[in-house]
């Protein structure tokens, strides 16, 4: 059988029973805690924040600082003193994340628009502790102000809100006008100036409810490939670019068209399969010792829009914690989880198919410059005591952003090492430094029309501003920047080379030992026979090649070979 493909073989169904996740304890298999205990209470920490007064308004707890000790002592200027044998200080980026008050103000502004000139939103209001009074309810006309100025006379004068049935001629004329305006809007969008971070609007292109307008399926016939509108990339910091890029990605994904029409649909399926395999093989529950939480928990750093939520259900976790720098991505992840969680309700205590059976919480933050408690505790008081240490920390397609500086990498590894239990795993995917070196040594990197050095194909490319070293070994190991482009996914975003031996050496400083490292092609070829019958049918069909076999081919194969998977285990 060729190494770059897979043909499924018929096997006894009983051979795949071991694919069901079981929790290991001293080498013996056990069933899920939820299978054994039917009256178990939810692992969510949401119940702990339903108080009349927000967490940041309550009196300080004399033991509060103890929960931060394991992540390093804090000093007056806001920097963190790293532990675990590292004597460096990592500055906290003041503008890298959304503060608690800013998030509360944003939430209040969206949810509490009462009049044409509303008062400033209160910074003491949170989604979990919002209070209402009779005077705070908006009038019937002001309810529509948040959708824009529909008419001078309120809802009664807006022809779009009429419930009177229009005749066929009027309807066809209305549809014709809408199509004409849509074309003009697309032209204007392409020629408009890019917006800054503060101008990104998460509510663009929402249709006002109008039963008189028939929504045709013309949009499904055309797929709009993602393009970002980030200006002045050369002079902006990496955090600002990454945040705006993924905010725009979240916005545009809702109006691109059917996902199956994406030019990288098969490539995405391949990458998702790799992540299923990694989490399925390496994210394991272990019986808790002492006061550690007796739940199977995963910390997902740089969680994005929650693309790995299905994978966490696949391995049957109990608690999910997601952190990302993009506030719109975090909002989308929470929305995705909430909708799926509410689809089916189970009162038996057993896991239910087609729904998320785990509890989850999400937060906006930069895990490269802030500690995990600083990100989570303001919104989820007590979570560090209740849900940590975790069984696995996952960071997918994001760690390379930290290699801008050594300080950022060390800050990330402090968060990982301090969040993991002993025996827990650090699971991730990064660009392969070996792949980049091979492109350089084999002279497959060319100078483009702008004098920059580039390799890739029609699906992906990596562009260096200056000529890389002839031997492909970057010195020093940090700050080696290139611009990465992946069609319909990553639109010329700065990334940094991750010399793997440097990552390995740093992880060993934080008591994490390498257990697994393979490029994506090898992971797929070696593991897919075990997982083929377990994965979702549509995901598997998305892996089918033009010759009927399964795997990556052509330019897709080169694009996925750009990445490598790794697993580190915390030993002490």
From Swiss-Prot:
EC number from the UniProt entry: 2.1.1.56
Positions with biased composition (Low complexity): 123-140
Site features described as mRNA cap binding, chain residue numbers: 305, 311, 336, 400, 495, 563
Catalytic EC class: transferase
UniProt xrefs under Pfam families: mRNA_G-N7_MeTrfase
Keywords associated with the record: Methyltransferase, mRNA capping, mRNA processing, Nucleus, RNA-binding, S-adenosyl-L-methionine, Transferase
Domain mRNA cap 0 methyltransferase, chain residue ranges per copy: 262-571
Main subcellular location: nucleus
Cell compartments where the protein resides: Nucleus
Entries under SUPFAM superfamilies matching the protein: S-adenosyl-L-methionine-dependent methyltransferases
GO terms of molecular function: mRNA 5'-cap (guanine-N7-)-methyltransferase activity; RNA binding
Transmembrane segments: none
Family matches, as InterPro entries: mRNA_G-N7_MeTrfase_dom, RG7MT1, SAM-dependent_MTases_sf
GO cellular component: nucleus
Reactions catalysed: a 5'-end (5'-triphosphoguanosine)-ribonucleoside in mRNA + S-adenosyl-L-methionine = a 5'-end (N(7)-methyl 5'-triphosphoguanosine)-ribonucleoside in mRNA + S-adenosyl-L-homocysteine
Biased composition, class Basic and acidic residues, residue ranges: 24-39, 59-69
Transferase in keyword set: yes
Residues reported in the UniProt entry to bind S-adenosyl-L-methionine: 275, 302, 324, 366, 396, 401
Region (Disordered) residue spans: 1-75, 110-140
Amino-acid positions noted as binding mRNA in the UniProt annotation, renumbered to this chain: 271-272
Main function: Responsible for methylating the 5'-cap structure of mRNAs.
Family statement: Belongs to the class I-like SAM-binding methyltransferase superfamily. mRNA cap 0 methyltransferase family.
Official protein name in the record: mRNA cap guanine-N(7) methyltransferase
Gene name linked to the record: ABD1
């Amino acid at each position: 059988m060729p190494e770059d493909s897979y043909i499924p073989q018929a096997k006894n169904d009983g051979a795949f029973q071991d694919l069901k996740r079981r929790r290991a304890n001293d080498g013996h298999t056990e069933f899920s805690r939820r299978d054994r205990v039917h009256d178990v209470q939810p692992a969510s920490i949401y119940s702990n924040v339903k108080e009349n007064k927000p967490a940041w308004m309550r009196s300080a707890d004399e033991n509060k600082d103890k929960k931060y000790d394991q992540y390093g002592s804090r000093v007056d200027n806001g920097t963190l003193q790293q532990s675990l044998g590292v004597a460096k200080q990592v500055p906290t980026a003041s503008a890298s994340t959304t503060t608690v008050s800013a998030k509360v103000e944003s939430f209040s502004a969206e949810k509490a628009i009462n009049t044409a000139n509303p008062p400033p939103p209160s910074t003491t209001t949170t989604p979990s502790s919002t209070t209402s009074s009779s005077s705070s309810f908006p009038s019937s006309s002001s309810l529509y102000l948040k959708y824009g100025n529909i008419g001078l006379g309120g809802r009664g004068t807006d022809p779009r809100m009429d419930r009177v049935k229009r005749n066929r001629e009027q309807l066809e004329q209305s549809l014709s006008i809408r199509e004409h305006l849509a074309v003009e809007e697309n032209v204007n969008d392409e020629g408009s100036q890019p917006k800054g971070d503060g101008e990104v609007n998460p509510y663009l292109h929402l249709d006002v409810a109008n039963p008189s307008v028939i929504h045709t399926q013309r949009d499904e016939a055309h797929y709009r490939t993602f393009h970002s509108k980030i200006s002045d990339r050369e002079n902006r910091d990496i955090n600002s670019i990454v945040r705006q890029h993924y905010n725009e990605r979240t916005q545009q994904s809702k109006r691109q068209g059917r996902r199956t029409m994406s030019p990288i649909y098969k490539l995405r399926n391949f990458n998702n399969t790799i992540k299923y395999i990694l989490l399925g093989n390496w994210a394991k529950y272990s019986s808790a010792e002492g006061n550690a939480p007796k739940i199977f928990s995963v910390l997902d750093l740089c969680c994005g829009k929650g693309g790995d939520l299905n994978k966490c259900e696949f391995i049957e976790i109990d608690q999910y914690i997601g952190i990302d720098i993009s506030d719109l991505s975090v909002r989308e992840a929470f929305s995705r989880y909430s909708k799926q969680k509410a689809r089916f309700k189970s009162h038996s205590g057993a896991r239910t198919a087609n729904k998320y059976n785990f509890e989850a919480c999400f937060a906006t933050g930069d895990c490269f410059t802030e500690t995990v408690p600083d990100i989570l505790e303001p919104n989820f008081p007590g979570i560090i005591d209740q849900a940590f240490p975790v069984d696995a920390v996952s960071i997918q397609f994001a760690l390379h952003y930290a290699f801008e500086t050594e300080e950022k990498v060390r800050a990330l590894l402090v968060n990982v090492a301090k969040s993991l239990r002993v025996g827990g795993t650090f699971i991730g995917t990064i660009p392969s430094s070996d792949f980049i070196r091979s492109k350089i040594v084999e002279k497959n990197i060319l100078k483009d029309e702008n004098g920059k050095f580039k390799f890739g194909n029609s699906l992906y490319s990596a562009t260096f501003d200056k000529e890389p070293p002839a031997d492909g070994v970057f010195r020093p190991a940090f700050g080696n920047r290139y611009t990465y482009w992946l069609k319909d996914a990553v639109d010329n975003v700065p990334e940094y080379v991750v010399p793997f031996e440097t990552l390995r050496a740093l992880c060993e400083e934080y008591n994490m030992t390498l257990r697994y490292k393979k490029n994506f092609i090898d992971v797929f070829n070696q593991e897919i026979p075990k997982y083929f019958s377990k994965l979702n049918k549509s995901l598997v069909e998305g892996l089918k090649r033009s010759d009927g076999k399964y795997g990556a081919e052509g330019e897709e194969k080169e694009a996925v070979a750009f990445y490598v998977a790794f697993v580190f285990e915390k030993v002490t």
